[in-house]
């Protein structure tokens, strides 16, 4: 009797590791945003270190215009509240993560009340710090822009000068085989990026720095 051979699922970490054109730190090469998370809890100490990393991000005039709301599965009601701030498509997979966070940005400088044009940029820097710290601890972070800002404002009493801008699912990567087919395919697809020649210019818009000899 012949036994059917089941297809094997490639290890996401192997598939997802970047193939950079030039050397980069391994934390950047190994970082990626999974859709699948295990139910393993994130320790309080690890979670604290992630937000400590965010704390030390650079920002314009040291304004630090970011605020985060965080919820873990240890507090089901809080977790459900934060989950409800995501669009339906993101709720479907993010609900498996052990930790969810909401990134809020303040659009005004605290002292002058003037618009802070760097605010969203700086929130991104804080979250990037968090992501790299998470990667160093064997954790993964999937950032989302698909959320419901008005829902978040109401549930968390976010003031008028601030806005829920992004959400983060944090945890340990799960085997992609346990995901719905469409998400499994995404978790198993190689990471792709435009070459630097397409976004690093010199002299004028569209003039590649690599072609001009500024970069290799």
Predicted segments, located by residue:
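Acidic, surface-exposed loops and disordered segments
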Residues: 1-216
């Amino acid at each position: 009797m012949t036994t059917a051979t089941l297809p094997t699922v490639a290890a996401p970490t192997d598939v997802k590791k970047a193939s950079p054109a030039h050397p980069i730190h391994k934390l950047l090469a190994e970082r990626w945003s999974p859709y699948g998370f295990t139910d393993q809890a994130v320790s309080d100490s690890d979670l604290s270190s992630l937000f400590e990393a965010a704390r030390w991000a650079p920002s314009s005039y040291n304004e630090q215009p970011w605020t985060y709301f965080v919820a873990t599965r240890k507090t089901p009601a809080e977790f459900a509240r934060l989950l409800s701030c995501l669009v339906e498509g993101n709720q479907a997979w993010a609900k498996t993560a052990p930790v969810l966070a909401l990134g809020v940005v303040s659009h005004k400088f605290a002292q002058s009340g003037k618009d802070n044009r760097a605010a969203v940029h700086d929130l991104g820097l804080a979250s990037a710090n968090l992501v790299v710290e998470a990667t160093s601890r064997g954790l993964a972070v999937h950032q989302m822009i698909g959320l419901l800002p008005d829902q978040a404002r109401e549930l968390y009493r976010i003031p008028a000068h601030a806005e829920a801008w992004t959400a983060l699912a944090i945890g340990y990567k799960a085997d992609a085989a346990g995901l719905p087919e469409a998400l499994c395919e995404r978790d198993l697809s190689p990471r792709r990026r435009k070459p630097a020649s397409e976004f690093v210019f010199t002299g004028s818009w569209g003039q590649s720095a690599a072609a001009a000899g500024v970069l290799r």
